[in-house]
């Protein structure tokens, strides 16, 4: 009987129920997967090797997840959102705009930036992906047509890299 052996450069290899899982060690450096067999006589025969390009994940996009007619919806900014939808939202999430990849991101924090009646810019921070009570109170008091910004959104993906995401312009309807 032959034993199949698999090895990888620039990565970690794990056997799964469906086959093999490869997790690259370093982005931007090729990963090479090699397969060989070991025969009954103990001789190892190389079957082949295949290089793969390992790219950095693109930056995700921040959004406010809310409920619309009982279904989850995503607000990415620059258009009006109802005050009710805004107040019912729990916080900020992040995802890749490219639907081909299902990558999970954790929002580590963000700032809600608004202008008071005197035109002064005020920032209120959250140290998670959730709106704070103070941020929710500010949104509750916003009148129709007012704008505020969600900025300095920090998100971390499965690669462990923390990224600062572009701001969201929120228009209260």
Model-identified regions with their sequence ranges:
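Short, aromatic- and glycine-rich surface loops/edge beta-strands on solvent-exposed regions
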Residues: 5-7, 28-41, 48-51, 145-157
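Extracellular/luminal low-complexity segments enriched in Ser/Thr/Pro
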Residues: 19-27, 137-142
């Amino acid at each position: 009987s032959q034993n199949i052996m698999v090895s990888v450069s620039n990565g970690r290899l794990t056997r799964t129920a469906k086959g093999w899982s490869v997790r690259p060690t370093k982005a931007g450096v090729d990963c090479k997967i090699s397969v060989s067999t070991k025969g009954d006589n103990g001789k190892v025969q190389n079957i082949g090797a295949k290089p793969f390009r390992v790219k950095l994940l693109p930056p995700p996009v921040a959004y406010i997840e809310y409920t619309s007619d009982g279904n989850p919806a995503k607000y990415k900014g620059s258009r009006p959102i109802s005050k009710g939808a805004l107040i019912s939202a729990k916080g900020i999430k992040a995802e890749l705009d490219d639907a081909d990849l299902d990558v999970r991101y954790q929002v580590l924090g963000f700032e809600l930036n608004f202008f008071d009646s005197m035109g002064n810019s005020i920032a209120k921070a959250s140290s998670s992906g959730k709106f704070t009570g103070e941020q929710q109170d500010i949104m509750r008091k916003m009148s129709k047509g007012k704008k505020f910004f969600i900025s300095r959104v920090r998100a971390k993906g499965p690669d462990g890299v923390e990224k600062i995401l572009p701001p969201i312009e929120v228009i209260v309807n």
